[in-house]
Amino acid sequence: KDGSGGYVFAQYEFDAYENNDNYDWLDAVTRTGVEQNHALSFSGASEKGAYYLSFGYSNKKGMVKNLGDTRYNGRINSDYSIKSWLKVGTCLLYTSPESEIFSDDGVYDKARGANPMLPVDSEIYTLNYGGIEDNNYFNPIRTLKIENDRRRNRLSSTNFLNINPLKGLNIRTSFSLDFFQEDRFKYTPKDIQESIRYSQDGQAEHTRDQRMVWQWDNSISYDRIFGKHKINALFSTSATQTDRDYTYATGKGYGTDRFSYYNIGASYKTDERSIGSDFVTATLMSYVVRADYNYASKYYLTATARYDGSSKFAKGHRWGLFPSFSAAWNIAEENFMKEQRVFNQLKLRLGYGL
């Protein structure tokens, strides 16, 4: 007995002690994890181009019951020289993972910390030590009844065109697109402690996060060497737009668990329904001019200017000019440094920029 005259141990604990019983709650919520991966690829090349195709499938069954992941993916890489001065290429990637994940209430940790003298029982709502009920210590076997699924789709593509019309002159344009969508579905049944404690009588949730980003880059560069003089000039532009759509819906109170998260609007607790959305579009535009000059790999001059604009800033403050200048002296290339053995590289550089 304890100081108040009550029993420290409950009767079931005395029985387990007398019968030398030891109950493994962890075994009740775990299994042997299995993972399988399959891949198929094709590739080829010629003097004018090359290609690569791959397809993959993977399936994982986690150590905790109901924990799993199925994934499909595909990839295409290709580049081709249409003419000696014209080259095109593309890269396409698709992934589609689908996951069944257990509730955030910590199935594994609760089972690992369960009372080893408490008989494994899926019908009790909480795990107890002694005769004390702990409403925070949910039965992990019942927690496995929570449906918590996630589906993702992602498609990304990058394409380019490269032109070399004259010696030293390069013109390049590239366009990339990245689309991502994630759906999360969760249903907490009405007859488990997580629902009973918070008077949910069943709760259904659905969230969707969708994003699309596109970027278009263009550049013209000229690179030539005239005796000891080397020049490089670049002009480039970049435009990016990001669109994000986010929606969510939650319902509480269901007469049956039969419909899971498929009919959120059927909840009878209408004052506890929740729905919301968020739509955001952001754009970024950049212009870059750069000129490099060096003489005999000794003396260097560089001038750069960026002109950037972003829709995230207030009107009247969306554009900014950022110039920079630098000069360098490669002292190690001077004749008076040839005989010394202390330095193999010594350069002095000064720069200024915003």
Outline where the language-model segments fall.
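Surface-exposed loop/interface segments of Gram-negative outer-membrane beta-barrel transport/assembly proteins
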Residues: 1-21, 32, 62-156, 172-285, ...
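Predominantly transmembrane beta-strands of Gram-negative outer membrane beta-barrel pores used
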Residues: 29, 37-59, 63, 75-81, ...
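Outer-membrane beta-barrel architecture
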Residues: 41-43, 54, 77, 158-160, ...
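Conserved interaction-surface patches within small, structured recognition/assembly domains
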Residues: 35, 39, 60, 284-287, ...
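Short, contiguous hydrophobic alpha-helices characteristic of membrane insertion segments
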Residues: 51, 287-305
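Transmembrane beta-strand segments that form the barrel wall of outer-membrane beta-barrel proteins
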Residues: 55-61, 301-313, 350
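Short glycine/threonine-rich loop-to-helix capping motif typified by GTGT followed
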Residues: 315-319
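Residue-level signature of outer-membrane beta-barrel architecture
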Residues: 44-46, 57, 80, 92, ...
